[in-house]
Amino acid sequence: MSRLTVYHQSTPDIPNKVLSHHVDIAATLAELGIRFERAEASLPVPAGAGQEEVIATCRGEIDAWMAKGGYLDIDVISVDEDHAQHMPWQAELLREHRLAGEWVLCVVAGRVQISLHVGDYLYSVLCERDDRLVVPAGMAHWLDMGERPRIVAMRLFTDAYGWRPDYVEPSAHERFPSFEG
């Protein structure tokens, strides 16, 4: 079940709000300019599937997003427990960063926690299969796949160069609870 946990930076270990109903999560995030949607994935895709397989399986949804949102690039995150140690870029996703363009996180299988740092608050969204999160340009965030990752997700970018992080220093991610997975 998807979940939104909101923290104030002065009390990073005590949530101010915890929501688990899709409508409540979407309404809270909409106030920040973030869209939270549900869309059924095309077909099941196993964690650890290659980028080509994921894109081929989800081609219809990708084409729809590209057409309606002006997205120019896509990448795939596909990790399972057996291959997690071979993914050194996971540490880069955990560092707080911003992207120049709007981007979409489409969770196809498994789960991932995305933390969005807005002003004095952290909005931590546990996204699961079929969740779609549209993040505005310039919003500080990080992705946490947990200690035992099992995730297949697509990221669509309005920036033609894809994922080009602008890291935030100091990063806030170490002050807040991590995703246990």
Please identify what each model-predicted range represents.
Residues 98-118:
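Short, conserved beta-strand element in jelly-roll/cupin
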Residues 127-147:
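Conserved metal-binding segment of the jelly-roll/cupin
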